[in-house]
Amino acid sequence: MIPFFGQSWSVFAPEPINGNFTLKVRAQTRQDGKDQTTDWVDATAVEVSLIKHNLFPPRAGIQAMELASEFKSNWDALSADHKVVVGLGYYVGTDWPIRLNKKLQSYGNPQAVAAYLESENTVIKYSTQVAKAIWGDSVVRVQFQIYRQNVVPFKDRKTPSPQPLQIANVGWRGLEIAPGQSDQDFADVFRKQYEKMR
């Protein structure tokens, strides 16, 4: 999908864009004092379904893909130690973002950490909207999974053996809401599209 919606010089480069990014979201909901983990929802597939067979596709149909692409680039720039920390759950209390930042900074490379945390924060806000759109106000925390799947090169098309998914593992996170964010407007569009796909 990316070559069609990421039209830039890189589409025609010697090594053109050759993979798809996916953003999946799941949540933990609390009912009667018990937490339950939901199934994964492929937010990218829901958004792409807005574009499919649509002569005038909305820009909303590529948000998850763009977020996933930027996030994966920033995640790739982290060290192995950083990635271990990112894979842990940070959601207890209101200071979990500060604790996560402090722990990541302790492993150095402050520029990569800052870029990563900025993209993670954006994806958490998006994941919060997705989770609330599907599971409502019982959502207490979210987890997202972002991965890239390379496309089989044209010369190897007759013997396809797709490379393994390049997964960015992230632990559970507390909910984040952007100022001015309308959960209701998002839910009206996203939930309707999600229900069509089921």
Residues covered by each model-derived region:
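Short extracytoplasmic
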Residues: 2-28
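A composition-driven signal for long, intrinsically disordered, charge-rich low-complexity tracts
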Residues: 7, 11, 55, 148-153
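Tryptophan-centered motif/residue detector
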Residues: 9, 37-43, 172, 176
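Secondary-structure boundary elements
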Residues: 16-18, 31-33, 131-138
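Structured domain cores in non-transmembrane regions
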Residues: 18-122
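Glycine-rich, aromatic-bearing surface loops/beta-hairpins
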Residues: 96-198
